[in-house]
Amino acid sequence: MDVSKISPGKDLPNDINVVIEIPQGSQVKYEVDKDSGALVVDRFLFTPMAYPAAYGFIPGTLAADGDPADALVLTPAAVVPGSVIRARPIGMLKMEDESGQDEKIICVPHDKVHPQFSNVHSVDDLPEITKKAITHFFERYKDLEPNKWVKVTGWADKAEAGKVIMEALAAAK
């Protein structure tokens, strides 16, 4: 897969594309190799936990950690790794890890992809248990890995997520 040929979206930062690397429910961390475009197994999670949502990145972006901007997409079904999904950002999980700042843009499928989340416009519209599950996963998923750690510092609104997306787009140019 040549990620450089995938558009970051139709109406940035409100209508974006997310390349899915990890399906919801996976205990395997996959990554798209920057050089070959192949989907490779980065590692198996050391903790007995599974990703709470589809996980991937926004193509054409460069986040503060030197990788494309990370995104989670809440979906009604598992999405195959390597798929590109049209999504709407609704907020952001703010975190730090052993490598520094590491935000996760929280998204839902665009209404044209599936209407289940058509009334969700902010992370505040999500059930509290969904936010708690996402927070819990990211606070704990590296617990058993040597020299790795994560600190969740809070949630941000759609406007702040949009600012981070636009900064990551500018950084990639």
UniProtKB/Swiss-Prot annotation:
The keyword Ion transport does not apply. Gene3D superfamilies: Inorganic pyrophosphatase. CDD domains: pyrophosphatase. Substrate binds at residues 29, 43, 55, 141. It is found in: Cytoplasm. GO terms for molecular function: inorganic diphosphate phosphatase activity; magnesium ion binding. It is an enzyme of class 3 (hydrolase). It catalyses: diphosphate + H2O = 2 phosphate + H(+). Its cofactor is Mg(2+). One of its GO terms (cellular component) is cytoplasm. Mg(2+) 2 binds at residue 70. Its EC number is 3.6.1.1. GO terms for biological process: phosphate-containing compound metabolic process. Mg(2+) 1 binds at residues 65, 70, 102. It comes from the Bacteria. Keywords: Cytoplasm, Hydrolase, Magnesium, Metal-binding. Disulfide bonds: none annotated. HAMAP family: Inorganic_PPase (MF_00209). Homohexamer. Catalyzes the hydrolysis of inorganic pyrophosphate (PPi) forming two phosphate ions. Belongs to the PPase family. This is Inorganic pyrophosphatase. It comes from Gluconobacter oxydans (strain 621H). The gene is ppa.
